[in-house]
């Protein structure tokens, strides 16, 4: 896929990011950048570090050394980040986990508006309105009152995407987004991601799905042994 029109400076930049767990080097100097409006796919075998990179970008995984830059915000290794820096980071990033992690006892709409109200201080009425708009954008407004267990896999994923977009982040991270989807749902997701890019989002996706990555990604970064080994 050709690069998106109008791409500007990097929204995301990783420089020589390293992570060890005991004697194992999980990330061995990961360096790459992502421009605004790109869909970048991280591919590689299990254990290559794809999901770890996403969690690290989102501030969910500490790392020993290197730098992660998200727009004008710099995250450093070895725990040298203030609570305020991490709070600002989470306003810039939305993450969709492989297994969604929706709260099973809460309706879909509450799953979307809960974090903006309680973690980001968004007024309740504004957060509810935003949740309704996002569910409509993603085509699941009719499931607003459904519990997660009542949703299909595709519906649950769309609610999870709505939740990730609830604080209007410029960067969206997705871990194995096609894992539970059939061919038709994959096509729907591909179209949705293009729509999100058209609205000014930037996406980084970790996936094993070669066909999906090649059909929707601006670039594919291939990881092996904790580093980016090639890109195409």
Each model region followed by its residue ranges:
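Helix-to-loop junction immediately C-terminal to a conserved catalytic motif
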Residues: 58
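Conserved signature/switch motifs of ABC ATPase nucleotide-binding domains
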Residues: 146, 167, 199
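The feature captures the beta-strand-to-loop junction immediately N-terminal to the Walker
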Residues: 43-45
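Catalytic Walker B motif of ABC-type/P-loop ATPase nucleotide-binding domains
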Residues: 172-175
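Helix N-cap at the start of a conserved alpha-helix in ABC-type nucleotide-binding domains
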Residues: 183-185
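ABC ATPase NBD coupling module
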Residues: 75-94, 124-125
């Amino acid at each position: 896929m050709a690069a998106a029109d109008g791409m500007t400076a990097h929204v995301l930049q990783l420089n020589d990011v390293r992570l060890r767990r005991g004697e194992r080097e999980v990330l061995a100097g990961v360096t790459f950048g992502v421009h605004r409006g790109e869909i970048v796919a991280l591919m590689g075998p299990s254990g290559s570090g794809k999901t770890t990179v996403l969690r690290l970008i989102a501030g969910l995984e500490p790392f020993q050394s290197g730098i992660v830059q998200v727009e004008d915000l710099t995250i450093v290794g070895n725990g040298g980040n203030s609570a305020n820096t991490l709070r600002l980071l989470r306003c810039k990033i939305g993450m969709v986990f492989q297994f969604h992690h929706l709260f099973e006892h809460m309706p879909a709409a509450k799953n979307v508006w809960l974090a903006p109200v309680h973690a980001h201080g968004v007024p309740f009425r504004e957060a509810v309105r935003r949740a309704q708009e996002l569910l409509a954008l993603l085509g699941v407004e009719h499931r607003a009152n459904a519990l997660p267990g009542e949703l299909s896999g595709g519906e649950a994923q769309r609610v999870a995407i709505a939740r990730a977009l609830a604080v209007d982040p410029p960067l969206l991270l997705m871990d194995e987004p096609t894992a539970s989807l059939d061919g038709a749902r994959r096509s729907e997701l591909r179209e949705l991601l293009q729509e999100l890019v058209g609205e000014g989002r930037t996406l980084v996706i970790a996936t094993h799905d070669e066909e999906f990555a090649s059909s929707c990604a601006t670039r594919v970064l291939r990881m092996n042994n904790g580093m980016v080994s090639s890109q195409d």
